[in-house]
Each structure stands twice: as structure tokens, then as C-alpha cells.
Amino acid sequence: MSAPAQPRERSFPSIEFTDAEADAREFPSSRSRKYNYYQPSKKRATIYEDVTVDVQPDPERHLTQGWIYGFGDGPGGYPKEWTSAQSSNWHQFLDPNEEWEQSIYRNNSAVVHQVDLCLQNAKRARAYDGWNSAWLKFIERNLGAWMHAESGMGLHVFTSIQRSAPTNMINNAVCVNAAHKLRFAQDLALFNLDLSEAEEAFDGSAHKEVWQSAPEWQPTREAVERLTAIGDWAELLFCSNIVFEQLVGSLFRSELVMQVAARNGDYITPTIVGTGEYDYDRDLNYSRALFQMLARDEKHGIDNRKLFSRWMSEWFPGASTRARGLQPIWSQPADKSVTFSSSLEHAKTKFADVLAAIDVDIPEELNK
């Protein structure tokens, strides 16, 4: 009688731990159910930080193998050499406005809705009929001319550098800046069309000739065109948002149009121009934070402040001259409630405050 067959034993390879599996390493937050690959600015990370920080990494953060993309005949990724400014940590900058995809659509949608309601109500109430001819001519020539400045800066200044900075946080802020400019230019264009349809005396095409040949606007036009020729993205941002916008943009929008419109029977224009001023306030907010970070950098702060002073010496005299070139338009409204000198003084005061905030020396010529 044969012996019963022995049960067959299965053999398994021995388990060998390689420390490549999940949960292999112990570190301070290894047992936490939440994980951040960056340090939030506050106790909890915001949605802005979650969708923005390190979306555009670099070899100093996470890309240990170096840039994984680039042009065949150029440097890879986003070279820091695209600006003369230097930073110990470009990723330190976080947009104080916390702009990301959702906020762009939400904020711009709200502004477009506001402008649309304003224009609809103006036509329904025949608000333009109460305007005097001098004010109608002022809007026809000057607000239309400023539309070209906004469009040019949005399309050829900010759009051109919205992927030049070394971090996604800076590029997002610049991209939103471009969207602000283009949307405001569009609002002014729609306003121009509405006035052309509502008032026979309003020439909706006059702004072209004014922008191209009116003596008072040629210095401003030259400034916008010169800005487009700057190759350094940080210099372009500095000269646009810190110098030009303060001495020319805000001077025209805030210190003239917003001040005299109501006295000339116009309550529509301040609503539209006010959206542009609100946009610029947000754009100035991120610009101030960025240049403040660079000016106070522990390693490169001194060199950056010298660089900013050099940019200031190159652009301030021209911007000041261009601001004074606009002086004739202060005499065009029928009700001249503000003078050019008082408007310029207010603009200079705000400009000095911005320079102080980013640790840039105030030019001696500012007080002359």
C-alpha cells in the first residue's frame, strides 16, 4: 500500500524592503493625513496658494534633473537672466491680491456687468442730453485717446512679459494686469460707440487723429511706444506701474476725469473710469509687494535698490515732461473745478508714497 502524497508546498520569494515603497520614511509630517509641498504664508494654505505655488517649478525647487523643456536654440525654462534684478528666492513673492483663474473671471465679470448696466441706464434715462458741448468734446477727444494708451499697454507691454518671470506667482499677477488693461480699453471703446449712437454731435472716430497728431498727446504716445521696447521684464513693470501710471495714468484718470466729470453733468464716465482706477490699485498692490521684496532682499537688496534708482533716473524726467504735456486739456471742460498744478501736486504726493514703500530714493526734481 503506497504512502499518501504529501501536500505540495508553495514557495514565495522573500520580501525585501528597498525603502521605495509608500510610508517607508519617517519625517515630521509623515503621519499627517494632509501634505503640502510648500510652506503656506499663514497657518492654513489658501486656494490661491494651492493652485499657484510651484505650478511653474525650476531647478532650485523640485526639478533636480534640470529644466525638462526649452527652445532648441536658447536657454531652457524661465531664465533668471531675463531681468537685471536679483532675488535670493523668487518664489517668496505671493500676489497680495491672490489672483488666480477663478478670481480673474469673477472680478472681470462683475466689472463688465457694472459697465453694461451703467450704459443701459444712461441710454434709458437719456443722460447724455444734459451734457454741455465742451464736455462732450472733451470725452470725444481725450477719453478716446486714453483708450489707445490702455490698449497699447495691455497688448504690447503686459501681455508681452506675462510669461517672462521665473515663478508662476509673478507671471499670474502680470497676466491679470494685462487682462485689466485690455478689458478697460474695451469698456472705453463700448462707451465711445454708445455715445456715437446717442449723440449726433459726438464724433466717435476723432480719438484716432487726437492720439496720432494732437500735440498734447504725443508725449504720452511716445512714452507708451518706448515702454514696448524694454526687454527686461522687471524694468518694464517698474517703468509702467510705478513711474508712468503714477505720473501720467493716475494724473489723467483720477486727478482730472474723476474730479471734473460730475461738475459737468456727467455721472456716467466716473463709473467707467473708476473701474480702471480700481484695476490699477490692485496692479499697484502686487507691483509694490514685488519691488519691496527685491529692495529688502538680504543678499541682493543693495544692488536692487541701486538698479531701481538707475531706472528712475532714466524714466522719471521723461514721465514728468509727458505729464506736463497734458496740461492743455485741463482748460477744455466748461467747469474747470481743478487746476493742473493741484492735480499734478496730488499725483506727485502719491508717487512719493509709492517710492517710499519700495525703498527707492525720491528724485530731487519731484519737488521742483
Curated annotation (Swiss-Prot):
InterPro entries in the record: Ferritin-like_SF, MP_mOase_hydro, Phenol_Hydrox, RNR-like
Family the entry assigns: Belongs to the TmoE/XamoE family.
One GO MF term: oxidoreductase activity, acting on paired donors, with incorporation or reduction of molecular oxygen, NAD(P)H as one donor, and incorporation of one atom of oxygen
Disulfide partners: none
Top-rank lineage group of the source organism: Bacteria
Chemical reaction(s) catalysed: propane + NADH + O2 + H(+) = propan-2-ol + NAD(+) + H2O; phenol + NADH + O2 + H(+) = hydroquinone + NAD(+) + H2O
Subunit comment: The propane 2-monooxygenase multicomponent enzyme system is composed of an electron transfer component and a monooxygenase component interacting with the effector protein PrmD. The electron transfer component is composed of a reductase (PrmB), and the monooxygenase component is formed by a large subunit (PrmA) and a small subunit (PrmC). Probably requires the presence of the chaperonin-like protein PrmG to ensure a productive folding, resulting of a soluble PrmC, which leads to the active form of PrmABCD.
Disordered, as annotated region: 1-33
Keywords: Monooxygenase, NAD, Oxidoreductase
Keyword Oxidoreductase: yes
Function statement: Component of the propane 2-monooxygenase multicomponent enzyme system which is involved in the degradation of propane via the O2-dependent hydroxylation of propane. Under acetone induction, also able to catalyze the oxidation of phenol to yield hydroquinone.
Stimuli inducing this protein: By propane and acetone.
Protein name stated in the entry: Propane 2-monooxygenase, hydroxylase component small subunit
EC numbers on record: 1.14.13.227
A matching Pfam family: Phenol_Hydrox
Lineage, highest ranks first: Bacteria, Bacillati, Actinomycetota, Actinomycetes, Mycobacteriales
Class of this enzyme: oxidoreductase
